[in-house]
Amino acid sequence: MRIILLGAPGAGKGTQAQFIMEKYGIPQISTGDMLRAAVKSGSELGKQAKDIMDAGKLVTDELVIALVKERIAQEDCRNGFLLDGFPRTIPQADAMKEAGINVDYVLEFDVPDELIVDRIVGRRVHAPSGRVYHVKFNPPKVEGKDDVTGEELTTRKDDQEETVRKRLVEYHQMTAPLIGYYFKEAEAGNTKYAKVDGTKSVAEVRADLEKILG
């Protein structure tokens, strides 16, 4: 089962990716992790990626596609894989198709922007332990304090409203057009496309995914 997850940052893809990986026994392929692993391995593609990144440039789509092809040929991908964070643009999706990387399901996590802002901006973390709270959905027992240690909770820089809104604008400009692209691909019979209501609870979304994926 080869799956692509689409959806804005904060739409709940990460939580459900864990569930899909465990239930269907497929690995999650994140381009960031893949690039780091390739550089570390010292492979030919890894060396190319390192040279580009050391020069402060963005890795080309061609190189990322080559890395994806190399990665999905590995033994743990024999039953499929879960792509998160790639493709991000229509040219990348086209390049994947041309490279013969077929996908069984494209899942779009649909959540209104304002709810995403609410979800992310309300996060509070206890940095030393990694415990995460939410002022509305999962508040600590004492406002602003960690339940276990009583230490101050902080807000991650990435969770500040201005940053979140900027990332949402980028998502709508760059990645949202993929929704139309894959909808057409599904109409042509090249993949299956499903919209998932990401405003539901984690358990409800999980149940919906089980219905979709079988």
UniProtKB/Swiss-Prot annotation:
Binding-site residues, AMP: 31, 36, 57-59, 85-88, 92, 156, 167
SUPFAM superfamilies (UniProt xref): P-loop containing nucleoside triphosphate hydrolases
Pathway note: Purine metabolism; AMP biosynthesis via salvage pathway; AMP from ADP: step 1/1
GO MF terms held by the record: adenylate kinase activity; ATP binding
Domain of life: Bacteria
InterPro entries linked: Adenyl_kin_sub (IPR006259), Adenylat/UMP-CMP_kin (IPR000850), Adenylat_kinase_CS (IPR033690), Adenylate_kinase_lid-dom (IPR007862), P-loop_NTPase (IPR027417)
Region (NMP): 30-59
N6-acetyllysine found at: 192
Region LID: start-end pairs: 122-159
Enzyme Commission number(s) from the entry: 2.7.4.3
Binding site for ATP: 10-15, 123, 132-133, 200
Keywords in alphabetical order: Acetylation, ATP-binding, Cytoplasm, Kinase, Nucleotide biosynthesis, Nucleotide-binding, Transferase
Chief location bin: cytoplasm
GO cellular component entries: cytoplasm
Localization: Cytoplasm
Gene Ontology biological-process entries: AMP salvage
Catalytically driven reaction(s): AMP + ATP = 2 ADP
Assembly behavior: Monomer.
Role noted for this protein: Catalyzes the reversible transfer of the terminal phosphate group between ATP and AMP. Plays an important role in cellular energy homeostasis and in adenine nucleotide metabolism.
Family: Belongs to the adenylate kinase family.
Free-text comment about domains: Consists of three domains, a large central CORE domain and two small peripheral domains, NMPbind and LID, which undergo movements during catalysis. The LID domain closes over the site of phosphoryl transfer upon ATP binding. Assembling and dissambling the active center during each catalytic cycle provides an effective means to prevent ATP hydrolysis.
UniProt name for this protein: Adenylate kinase
Gene (UniProt): adk
